[in-house]
């Protein structure tokens, strides 16, 4: 799919404490869809982070995370979502779902099936080695 112009890609995440791994992900997605394509970031709302990741407190609230992501030239729009699934994406016009290797739970499996049934491509991109939000928070905590 490399450089397919005019395609729209989506990816899911919290994207708290933006770091090099996030920037690389967004850059790779932009590379895949081309400059005339669209990159939409499905950004999890605060209430669901607290529910699905107990004990994992966000540094930035949703509005701040959305503003930060939307200032990046590689991203066209950050869209709120509560839970990963068909309901979150069915009304969004997209061609490609971008996921990481860790996205294997049942919700993602149902979404992958829906994508296959609806002509949407699913692309798995590797994580950027050596960096993660969790690792960053641990480093900051130890300072």
Show the residue positions of the predicted features.
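Nucleotidyltransferase catalytic core that binds NTPs
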Residues: 1-143
